[in-house]
Amino acid sequence: MEVKVVINVAIVEDEQEAVEYLSDCLHRYGEKTGETFSFTHFPEPITFLEKYKPVYDMVFMDIRMPMMDGMQAAKKLREADTSVLLVFVTRMGDYAIQGYDVGATAFIKKPISYFDFEMKMKRIIF
């Protein structure tokens, strides 16, 4: 009997439309590849960080959010968990260099295209 591995994902994103599209992309990618994703949405990074436990395999994080931006949140995340895969989802491509300082695995540019999402996921999940 094959044991199904579930990939636990946190989506830290304040735009509901982006959350819905990311969750659709995860479901679509899972149907295509046989991967199973479980995700939790956090509308802002402070709650995510306050409740953070290293149970996530992957974190999708927006950069521009109120109260705390994604770069600050990523630095705090790395203090708690150095191994979680971190994927920034942003309109701001000029943050790429800073992203490497916090160990970002990938960047997905908004508006999100499924093709871009799938290409990044193929590279991230071996």
Residue ranges of each PLM-predicted region?
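Conserved SAM-binding loop
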Residues: 11, 41, 88-89
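Two-component/phosphorelay signaling modules centered on CheY-like receiver
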Residues: 15-40
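Non-catalytic signal-transmission and effector/linker regions of two-component phosphorelay proteins
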Residues: 1-10, 20
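CheY-like receiver
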Residues: 56-126
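Acidic, metal-coordinating helix/loop segments flanking the phosphotransfer/catalytic sites
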Residues: 38-58
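Alpha-helical elements of the RecA-like P-loop NTPase motor core of helicases
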Residues: 20, 50, 97
